[in-house]
């Protein structure tokens, strides 16, 4: 008997989990298929979640009603706020995960989710009828019919592990690869690229000499990614810092001919921002040393991840490298590092909803779209799940703009510009990063999460209370006038500020660079009455008000361009005077509006002006296909 679902999700990694949960929570009957149920939410590379830009994505997923933040809050072994000495736009949370606990907690959540079935099975083929996906077929011939399919296959598509001169078919961590589905996608006409990533060796904690390394503790205050988290893990495990040296580099130099990276065995493009140790040695050979972080993989294992030592060198060379590193001279290697090549689709073949242009109701999310990182995958996953469910249920799709979220930046970059290497999200990619902060992810996206049915009534009530408290406190400080008495002058001078000549509104005093919210309370002789997150918002919104308003003005200009819609079926060959490169790129990307068209590489301002003229004169409707 053929089983029927609204949505089928292929894969149960970080993209698949968020896609499946979002789809089910929106009310779609959802099936998640995975090669091995024991590897749900597996972390094949680094045992961490978050970091610059990525940590903000985790907060955004949480604000939309996703799961990653809640799970890492329950299962981390260490948490740190990064870039605390810099402005709020680049601050981000990073957590070290207990990999096994993280998997177990995610599996528990999935198994207890209404509307979601989980099944072990390898999908070999998509069922396509009239350029529309109708379901999937597994390697044992089982058919699952559905109204939409989301592919979240990670690095499994035609995966090959490479170690020295050894190369064999495999998914990450020596799991089964997905070869037949990869061939199926090629047969369906998708433009496929070959990418590469890698992982470092793991060593036994009992054999590390930590006295030769530098301790890297977590923060000693409770931190969390999720708005819902109220209990914090304070019993944390440290990481440790060590370095490569001249001896390490000599081992690499002597054996560079054995590296798959430089022997020609690896054809795929690797990640620019996470290079192998061989790559670092060659590209930055003026550097006398490179940082290595020793990261525990969990509370109940001795495996330690050697962050920064990703390699495809043979196993015996990896051992030689470890012997040269302070603290690791006698370390037992428990797993060798390796490189992995895999298939990815060219992401300009997608609409901003992550639906494929060629096949209706087929969505893709995660590393199959050319990205790297658990967080980037999860961010795409939740949007693919939201949109697939909204599509089949008729409840509407959502596209996050570049000013809404880092997830919006990520997806727009992929579908508009494409990528010729594994894409990593960076704060520098976001032109509105002062608006897209770690601290305001809930304020930006909780309303949307609630409208989509992914945020509970109880949580939404708490969120609205927080939002009102921020508004009320800013208004209160706007109404309170501080007198220039000796008490006030002494505190201001102690903070390095200049004495007041006249009275001043509390809100204006807070805008001074040397002032903070706590100092204002001290001047007013008041105690802390509000939650820390509310006080933080009051301070940031006040101090950066001018810059924030400038960014908002820029956003309004772009929104006016986004309002100028372009028909999906426009025939650009019939638009006179467009440059040939612009005509080709516009036909490939099929931008939905003038703003997106302006971001396409190869489309210049003159081409945009021509499109605007056609749009304003109503000519675009006449050149549709």
UniProtKB/Swiss-Prot annotation:
Biological process terms from the Gene Ontology for this record are: tRNA methylation; tRNA wobble uridine modification
Detail which positions bind FAD.
Answer: 11-16, 123, 178, 367
* UniProt-annotated location(s): Cytoplasm
Positions that bind NAD(+): 270-284
Q: Which InterPro entries match?
A: FAD/NAD-bd_sf, GIDA_C_N, MnmG, MnmG-rel, MnmG-rel_CS, MnmG_C, MnmG_C_subdom, MnmG_C_subdom_sf
UniProt keywords, alphabetically: Cytoplasm, FAD, Flavoprotein, NAD, tRNA processing
**Gene Ontology cellular component terms for the protein in this record:** cytosol
> Has UniProt tagged this entry with the keyword Transferase?
no
Q: Which cofactor does it need?
A: FAD
Q: Does the keyword tRNA processing apply?
A: yes
Q: What is its main location?
A: cytoplasm
- Origin superkingdom: Bacteria
Please provide, alphabetically and separated by semicolons, the GO molecular function terms listed in this UniProt record. Answer: flavin adenine dinucleotide binding
What does the similarity note say?
Belongs to the MnmG family.
Q: What does this protein do?
A: NAD-binding protein involved in the addition of a carboxymethylaminomethyl (cmnm) group at the wobble position (U34) of certain tRNAs, forming tRNA-cmnm(5)s(2)U34.
Q: How does it assemble?
A: Homodimer. Heterotetramer of two MnmE and two MnmG subunits.
Protein name in the entry: tRNA uridine 5-carboxymethylaminomethyl modification enzyme MnmG
State which gene encodes it. mnmG
């Amino acid at each position: 008997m053929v089983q029927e679902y609204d949505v089928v999700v292929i894969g149960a990694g970080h993209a698949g989990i968020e896609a499946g949960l979002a789809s089910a929570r929106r009310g779609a009957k959802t099936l998640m298929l995975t090669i091995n149920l024991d590897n749900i939410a597996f972390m094949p590379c680094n045992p961490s979640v978050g970091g610059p830009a990525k940590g903000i994505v985790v907060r955004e997923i949480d604000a939309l009603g996703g799961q990653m933040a809640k799970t890492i809050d329950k299962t981390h072994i260490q948490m740190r706020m990064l870039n605390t000495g810099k402005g709020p736009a680049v601050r981000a949370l990073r957590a070290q995960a207990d990999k096994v606990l993280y998997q177990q907690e995610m599996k528990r959540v999935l198994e207890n989710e209404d509307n979601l079935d989980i099944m072990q099975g390898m999908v070999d083929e998509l069922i396509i009828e009239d350029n529309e996906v109708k379901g999937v077929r597994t390697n044992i011939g089982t058919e699952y019919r559905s109204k939409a399919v989301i592919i979240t296959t990670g690095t499994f598509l035609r995966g090959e592990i490479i170690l020295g001169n050894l190369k064999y078919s495999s998914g990450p961590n020596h799991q089964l690869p997905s070869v037949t589905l990869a061939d199926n996608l090629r047969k369906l006409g998708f433009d496929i690229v070959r990418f590469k990533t890698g992982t470092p060796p793991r060593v036994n904690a009992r054999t590390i000499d930590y006295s030769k390394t530098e301790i890297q503790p977590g923060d000693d205050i409770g931190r969390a990614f999720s708005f819902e988290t109220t209990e914090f893990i304070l019993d944390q495990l440290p990481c440790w810092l060590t370095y490569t040296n001249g001896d390490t580099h000599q081992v690499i130099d002597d054996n560079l001919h054995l590296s798959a990276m430089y022997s020609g065995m690896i054809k795929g493009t690797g990640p620019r921002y996470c290079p192998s140790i061989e790559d670092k040695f060659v590209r930055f050979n003026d550097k006398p040393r490179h940082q290595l972080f020793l990261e525990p993989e969990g509370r109940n294992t001795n495996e330690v991840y050697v962050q920064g030592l990703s390699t495809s060198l043979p196993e015996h060379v990896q051992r030689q490298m470890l012997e040269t590193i302070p603290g690791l001279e006698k370390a037992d290697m428990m797993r060798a590092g390796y490189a992995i090549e895999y298939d990815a689709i060219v992401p300009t073949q997608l609409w901003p909803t992550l639906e494929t242009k060629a096949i209706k109701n087929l969505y893709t999310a995660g590393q199959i779209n050319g990205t790297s990182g658990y967080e980037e995958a999860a961010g795409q996953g939740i949007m693919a799940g939201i949109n697939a469910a909204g599509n089949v249920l008729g409840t509407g799709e959502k596209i996050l703009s570049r000013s809404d979220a880092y997830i919006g930046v990520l997806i727009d970059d992929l579908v508009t510009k494409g990528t010729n290497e594994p894409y990593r999200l960076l704060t520098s990619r976001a032109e509105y990063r002062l608006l897209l902060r770690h601290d305001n992810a809930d304020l930006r996206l909780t309303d949307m999460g609630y409208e989509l049915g992914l945020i509970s009534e109880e949580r939404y009530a708490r969120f609205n209370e927080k939002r009102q408290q921020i508004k009320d406190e800013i208004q209160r400080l706007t109404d309170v006038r501080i007198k220039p008495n000796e008490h006030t002058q002494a505190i201001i001078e102690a903070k390095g500020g200049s004495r007041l000549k006249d009275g001043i509104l509390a809100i204006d005093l807070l805008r001074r660079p040397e002032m903070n919210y706590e100092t204002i309370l001290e001047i007013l002789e008041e105690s802390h009455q509000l939650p820390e997150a509310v006080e933080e918002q009051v301070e940031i919104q006040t101090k950066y008000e001018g810059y924030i308003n400038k960014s908002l003005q820029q956003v309004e200009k772009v929104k006016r361009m986004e309002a100028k819609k372009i028909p999906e079926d426009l025939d650009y060959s019939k638009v006179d005077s467009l440059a040939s490169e612009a005509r080709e790129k516009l036909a490939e990307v099929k931008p939905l509006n003038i703003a997106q068209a302006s971001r396409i590489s190869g489309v210049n301002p003159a081409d945009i002006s021509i499109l605007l003229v056609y749009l304003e004169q109503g000519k675009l409707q006449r050149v549709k296909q």
